[in-house]
Amino acid sequence: MNIFLKSAGKQEGTSCVSNMVQLGDFFYISGQTGLGESIQEQTITAINKVIDVLSNYGLQLHHVVKFTVYLKNIEDKEAFLNTFKNFVDEPFPACTIVEVSNLADNATVCIDGLGVNTLRHEEQMQQSSCSHDCSSCGGGCH
């Protein structure tokens, strides 16, 4: 039996695969496939699926430290990266891009990831550094 602190629903079309699991501060996102005709459209939809999964935990893309990208055609790498760069900021995450012979649902791109949920630490740092009347930090300080 797997012991996860949290899991984010089942992956569409499956009965036994979670979209994301978290154990401790670490999380793992199952592959999210793209939709659309072009590699750009597929990249955007795949990333938006990743963003949706992350939002179930209150997380954002900057919490992902490593992506693995599966491309049906490695010649799409440059077009993928030109689209992907619009979603990530410095410091950029690690990323491995590999070519595969086939993907589910005739997708040309699939993206999975792993990361660290730092929300608890961010909140603690905010509370410990508060030196005002707490109006700007939501009243979470004591």
What kind of feature is each model-predicted range?
Residues 1-62, 71-142:
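N-terminal presequence-like segments and the immediate start of the first folded domain
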